[in-house]
């Protein structure tokens, strides 16, 4: 529930298996890796999330969907040199930035960071060839922050 309920610091991860071998291996890992164990705060947080978090999760998903829709529309309507792919199952928008005309991925990353003043995920993380010319934009943030980032990208792209 770490991402769904924004409780990453509570160590609330859980795993389930019917496979005896996987169970044995996971238990062995927990014995040697202190970071894998939960504490009382994590246990309470986990139970609270699963027992009382439905409304929060529903509201969060609705908010993120609206933010995603606004962000994708803004990019595709206002930044003609960038195309946004509407994600179906993640909070990252895949940006096709090849229309900006940069020759290297480094130039694209520098443009986003130095000119647009935004820090995006590098598309080449998903393959040097396949991700070249692409960036990922995280929209799992307050909507005004997301829109400010997109405005900065637009203004920087308009200056090219």
Where do the PLM segments sit?
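Short, solvent-exposed loop/turn elements at beta->coil junctions and helix N-caps
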Residues: 1-2, 81-82, 123-127
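Conserved core segment of the aminotransferase class I/II
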Residues: 1-65, 155-157
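Conserved glycine-rich beta-strand-loop-beta hairpin in the small C-terminal domain of fold type I
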Residues: 47, 63-72, 84-97
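A short beta-turn/loop motif at secondary-structure boundaries
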Residues: 5, 85-88, 127-131
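PLP-dependent enzyme catalytic core of the Aspartate aminotransferase-like
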Residues: 103, 111-120, 126-160
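Residue-level recognition of strand-loop junctions within catalytic nucleotide-signaling folds
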Residues: 18, 51, 96-98, 140-142
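Short amphipathic alpha-helical segments
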Residues: 10-11, 60, 89-91, 133-135
């Amino acid at each position: 529930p770490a991402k769904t309920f924004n409780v990453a610091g509570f160590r609330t991860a859980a795993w389930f298996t019917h496979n005896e071998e996987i169970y044995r291996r996971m238990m062995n890992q927990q014995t040697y890796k202190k970071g894998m164990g939960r504490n009382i705060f994590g246990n309470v947080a986990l139970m609270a999330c699963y027992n009382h978090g439905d409304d929060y999760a529903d509201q969060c998903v609705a908010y993120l969907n609206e933010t995603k829709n606004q962000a994708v529309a803004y990019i595709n309507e206002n930044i003609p040199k960038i195309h946004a792919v509407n994600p179906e199952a993640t909070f990252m928008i895949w940006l096709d930035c090849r229309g900006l005309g940069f020759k290297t991925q480094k130039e694209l990353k520098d443009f986003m960071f130095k000119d647009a003043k935004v820090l995006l995920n590098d598309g080449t993380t998903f393959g040097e060839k396949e991700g070249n010319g692409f960036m990922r934009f995280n929209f799992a943030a307050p909507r005004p922050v997301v829109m400010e980032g997109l405005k900065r990208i637009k203004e920087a792209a308009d200056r090219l």
